Regions:
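Face-selective signature of the C-terminal outer-membrane beta-barrel domain
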Residues: 1, 14, 19-172
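Intrinsic-disorder/low-complexity recognition with aromatic hotspots
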Residues: 6-9
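Short glycine-enriched, charge-decorated loop/helix-capping segments at active-site entrances
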Residues: 174-177
Length: 177
């Protein structure tokens, strides 16, 4: 990289070599369902569990050579990023017929979500390193009730839903909490 002034005189210049010595990304998702049908026609009880996982690791390195009049005091850097995301979802649903064309559906759901990240940067040629670690938690609890009506080509649905969410983000070193 070269930045030129009027008259094509270089203000500064350097060569940059960039590469990624490490990169991994894994994502897993799964689901389990259990459904129980009762003796009553159309009535069922369902339990569900879902899992979502993501793991990512990235290393990015820059090295600078042939430095002339640069405004930075280092000769390169290594940036390391790590992310861990985990989400568990639990759900229960009950569907009960109330008569011909009428149904009641009641359910609840709980989500536990954790996201953690660590970032660091090492500078070459000077004694200066940076690092940040962040933890984020979200918990969601919800409940619902629906009335469902079906008649020939027509259907209608009315319901209520309540949802409560708790969120917290923190830096383990205590800064900016």
């Amino acid at each position: 990289s070269t930045w030129l002034e009027h008259g094509d005189q270089p203000v500064y210049s350097y060569n940059n070599h960039y590469w990624m010595p490490g990169y991994q990304h894994h994502s897993w998702n799964g689901r389990l369902d259990y459904e129980h049908k009762t003796r009553r026609k159309g009535e069922r009880f369902t339990l569900s569990y879902m899992l979502a996982l993501t793991r990512q690791h990235t290393d990015q390195e820059n090295t600078y050579t042939e430095l002339q009049n640069v405004s930075f005091p280092y000769t390169g850097s290594l940036m390391t990023e790590r992310e861990r995301f985990t989400e568990h979802t639990f759900q229960a649903d009950w569907l009960r017929p109330l008569g011909k064309g009428h149904q009641l559906e009641i359910g609840t759901k709980y989500i536990d979500r954790n996201n953690n990240s660590e970032n660091s940067q090492q500078f070459y040629g000077i004694d200066m390193n940076t690092s940040d670690e962040f933890h984020h938690v979200t918990r969601v609890l919800a409940g619902y009730a629906d009335y469902i009506y079906n008649h020939e080509k027509w259907s209608a649905r009315a319901g209520l839903r309540y949802e409560y969410s708790y969120m917290r983000g923190s830096y383990p070193d205590g800064k900016d909490e």
